[in-house]
From Swiss-Prot:
The modification Phosphothreonine is found at residue 212. InterPro entries: Cms1, P-loop_NTPase. GO terms for molecular function: RNA binding. This is Protein CMSS1. The lineage of its organism: Eukaryota, Metazoa, Chordata, Craniata, Vertebrata. Belongs to the CMS1 family. The keyword Repeat does not apply. Gene3D superfamilies: P-loop containing nucleotide triphosphate hydrolases (3.40.50.300). It comes from Homo sapiens (Human). Residues 1-10 have a biased composition (Acidic residues). Residues 1-89 are annotated as: Disordered.
């Protein structure tokens, strides 16, 4: 026992055995914290968190707002207007108003006053109860006498202006009861050249002409049709096409009508040798 106690017993202890328990405890805690930091797995972002949150969320809303705005600002269609109110027959005031609107940006104020037509140059308008034959009989009761006295070529006694060639053929078929033995000429561009119509007007006497304003204007311009003997100019005013448009609702037709009126029609109306009718 004495020999054992005499030895330097602390030298034989293993390394770290002499350290205080407090020190060992502190070092152990530090090591565990480092190990925990190294071993804790870093959370991997999921597929949902990788995608930006604002993607494709705002743009569809803006598109919906834009579509609603354009719907609010859209122009009224003719079908919308007709659905709310019954169609009204055309009146001379309607033609006068269209003329003022058309020439307001092209003429001076003094010149616009010269375009005003007296009420005496207008015939009774169609009240939407007439067929074409019955309307023509009402506005021209002495047609047979006029037809017999007409012998001048390159001219007609009555012009009926419509919007298309198809409509012109319909009008020609519907006026059989009125025209009698009167000669009718088709005045439109479909399948008929201008020169062929000029030669036809030069060869024979014609009483009635039915066609589009563009072709009639071209014939007058080329000297194939003389408007001086003309007594009646009737507009196919109230008829509507598949899009429910009247002839004066179509910009191209409206422009050609006013250009034709300037080629001597207005002066004939003011001299009271020509009457205007709205069918």
């Amino acid at each position: 026992m004495a020999d054992d106690l005499g030895d330097e017993w602390w030298e034989n202890q293993p390394t770290g055995a002499g350290s205080s328990p407090e020190a060992s405890d502190g070092e152990g805690e530090g090591d565990t914290e480092v190990m925990q930091q190294e071993t804790v797995p870093v959370p991997v972002p999921s597929e949902k968190t990788k995608q930006p949150k604002e993607c494709f969320l705002i743009q569809p809303k803006e598109r919906k707002e834009n579509t609603t705005k354009t719907r609010k600002r859209r122009k009224k269609k003719i079908t919308d207007v007709l659905a709310k109110s019954e169609p009204k027959p055309g009146l001379p005031e309607d033609l006068q108003k269209l003329m003022k609107d058309y020439y307001s940006s092209r003429r001076l104020v003094i010149e616009l006053e010269e375009l005003n037509l007296p009420d005496s140059c207008f015939l009774k308008a169609n009240d939407l109860t007439h067929s074409l034959s019955s309307y023509l009989k009402e506005i021209c009761p002495k047609w047979v006498k006029l037809r017999k006295n007409h012998s001048e070529k390159k001219s007609v006694l009555m012009l009926i202006i419509c919007s298309s060639a198809v409509r012109a053929l319909e009008l020609i078929r519907s006026m059989t009861a009125f025209r009698g033995d009167g000669k009718v000429i088709k005045l439109f561009a479909k399948h008929i050249k201008v020169q062929a119509q000029v030669k036809l007007l030069e060869k024979r006497v014609v009483h009635l002409g039915v066609g589009t304003p563009g072709r009639i204007k071209e014939l007058v311009k080329q000297g194939g049709l003389n408007l001086s003997p003309l007594k009646f100019l009737v507009f196919d005013w109230n008829w509507r096409d598949q899009k429910l448009r009247r002839m004066m609702d179509i910009p191209e037709i409206r422009k050609e009508v006013f250009e034709l009126l300037e080629m001597g029609v207005l002066s004939l109306c003011k001299s009271e040798s020509l009457k205007l009718g709205l069918f």
